[in-house]
Amino acid sequence: KNDNYTELGVETSINFPRFMFPFISNDFKRRIRATTEFGLQYNYQMRPEFTRIVASGSWSYKWGLQRQRSQHRIDLLDINYLYMPWIEPEFKNNFLNDEKNYLLEYNYKDRLIVRTGYSYIYNSAGQALMNNAVIGNSYSIRFNFESAGNLLYVLSKMSNLKKNDQDEYTILNIPYAQYIKGDLDFAKNIVIDNRNSIAFHIGGGIAIPYGNARMIPFEKRYFSGGANSVRGWSVRSLGPGTFSDEKGNFMNQSGDIKLDASIEYRTRLFWKFRGALFVDAGNIWTIREYQDQPGGKFKFDQFYKQIAVAYGVGLRLDLDFFVLRFDGGMKAINPEKGKDRYPILRPDFGRDFAFHFAVGYPF
């Protein structure tokens, strides 16, 4: 069996220390003190089953206010082209059949994502956090919103373009995604003394496909598990809902709604080492009932019963400029259908443990 996998990526950007946009007065450009960024990215993936190319171009603005406490970013235009030049015939026949797995079939097709977005970050620590200074209690708020495909959909309607056999409008025979997506996260750090603190965060997000799309593109869907989520699960291995993936297909373990919450006790150990005890909770869900994700749909009378919980310990190496993080998580409450509901009562290290290595704190 050929398991070779190659991925190559390159990206470049150019930044201008001013707000670059026609028809805007010079006085406004001076007052806003924004930077303008143009970026290009290219990613090439070659697997035994397929070859995949993702090419992107972006135009964005960034600026900060109130001694660096607030940061704004506007993605005026972000274009992503997903191109599948080759798919292995047997893989295509076995898995990329609309009747067998619409989720896979949808995400292994050429697709265009033309989006705009806005993000806002507020951190009460401001410049002290940027300088890695010792600070007291602080909190942060993160908000993101993006939409894709709306202008293209209006133009398609006005031009009376014909749809393809999947009931999608296309641009140069390439179907385009249409959706809205929003995320909100709140985090707080409470200092107990000069060696100990407690940090917690709660966040959520939702992505809704409409118009020209029946599904959110995989790149824009949510996942759960991993170093910055519910750490009793490996990355992309939890959810949606009670869904349990016996086939090991990571694309099936993605969703349109996400909830996450964590609390950590953090302490200084010695030298540059820090320790942590943590509890995480969360999951993902779909907004529709997909055949390949049974039990994944979000329901108000069920979702709270499907919250996964994990606990664990962490070791962090604070090198001033960045933090190396080693976390070990254990499953406590498992919502997956057919699995032990409360592994915390009968812990099995081989079954319940997940190790994570990451750079930076989880929140």
Region locations from a protein language model:
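C-terminal outer-membrane beta-barrel translocator/porin domains of Gram-negative envelope proteins
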Residues: 1, 72-268, 277-300
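One-face residue pattern on beta-strands with alternating periodicity enriched for small/polar residues
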Residues: 9-15, 39, 58, 115-121, ...
